[in-house]
Amino acid sequence: MAGFTAADVKKLREMSGAGMMDAKKALEETGGDLEAAVDALRAKGLAAVQKKSSRTAAEGLVGVAVEGTKGVAVEVNSETDFVAKNDQFQDFVRKTTAVALTIDGDDVEALKAADYPDGGTVTDKLTNNVATIGENQQVRRMKTVTVSQGVVVPYVHNAVAPNLGKIGVLVALESDASADVLEPLGKQLAMHIAAAFPQALDADGLDADLIERERKIAAEKAAESGKPENVQEKMVEGAIKKFAKENALLSQVFVMDNKTAIADVVLAAGKDAGTTITLKDYVRFQLGEGIEKEESDFAAEVAAAVKG
């Protein structure tokens, strides 16, 4: 089909959970635009809400490190998962993450130019690794969180090595409570963040473009209901409030008990400790967010559908 390929149909199905023919039709209607096709499927109730880039594939590792009241997450990409399991690559990610703790802010270019523990710069070591391992690699991004008093708690979901894996989380808790109180709380919150994929700390932090996209989808659904315009407006506002509640960390329902808002979990922990605990910030890095991986082999049924 003009405008899209079998790979696009396959990717849309992965992104949306829609059936093959529904995915094909959506791509036809949107001229092959994947994001628009997802929105079209959702407006028709044929696709589940997908977290931003949650299914995009790329290889490599996310590293996390903490020193004092500062924590950092770093993503380093490779072409294959085989390299991600390589001891040399893992050592590079681990040491580069440690170097990132010395960088002010989230300047990945400054990280690349920084001194590497074994000599030269981070980029020099990366170039050497590419030559010896025989595969392209890239230091992609970094994110730092700090507290003036309290703890930053690191967590890696399904770690392949200490502090290395495909999902890395940092939780920044501001408080005068002891580490014995804060660290277990931070670990539970980090596990929640890894599972629940919040888009921002609170509703005010949600990306305006993301909200506008959800508003457009909600408006299309409301219009299809055939209800009066004033009712449609209430439906749209209700949908946006629900989206914000489900995607802002502080209003999300804690996955550990499936009933308590994260803000209330933190509040209760502070009361139990006889002090105030503030969830100041967090980082959630999932390997490959926003990176498209080239497809080289497609299911026969997808190819047949596109040709059909």
Swiss-Prot record:
<dbReference type="InterPro" id="IPR036402">
    <property type="entry name" value="EF-Ts_dimer_sf"/>
</dbReference>
<dbReference type="Pfam" id="PF00889">
    <property type="entry name" value="EF_TS"/>
</dbReference>
<dbReference type="InterPro" id="IPR001816">
    <property type="entry name" value="Transl_elong_EFTs/EF1B"/>
</dbReference>
<dbReference type="InterPro" id="IPR018101">
    <property type="entry name" value="Transl_elong_Ts_CS"/>
</dbReference>
<protein>
    <recommendedName>
        <fullName>Elongation factor Ts</fullName>
    </recommendedName>
</protein>
<feature type="region of interest" description="Involved in Mg(2+) ion dislocation from EF-Tu">
    <location>
        <begin position="80"/>
        <end position="83"/>
    </location>
</feature>
<dbReference type="InterPro" id="IPR014039">
    <property type="entry name" value="Transl_elong_EFTs/EF1B_dimer"/>
</dbReference>
<dbReference type="InterPro" id="IPR009060">
    <property type="entry name" value="UBA-like_sf"/>
</dbReference>
<keyword id="KW-0963">Cytoplasm</keyword>
<dbReference type="GO" id="GO:0003746">
    <property type="term" value="F:translation elongation factor activity"/>
</dbReference>
<dbReference type="GO" id="GO:0005737">
    <property type="term" value="C:cytoplasm"/>
</dbReference>
<keyword id="KW-0251">Elongation factor</keyword>
<keyword id="KW-0648">Protein biosynthesis</keyword>
<comment type="similarity">
    <text>Belongs to the EF-Ts family.</text>
</comment>
<comment type="function">
    <text>Associates with the EF-Tu.GDP complex and induces the exchange of GDP to GTP. It remains bound to the aminoacyl-tRNA.EF-Tu.GTP complex up to the GTP hydrolysis stage on the ribosome.</text>
</comment>
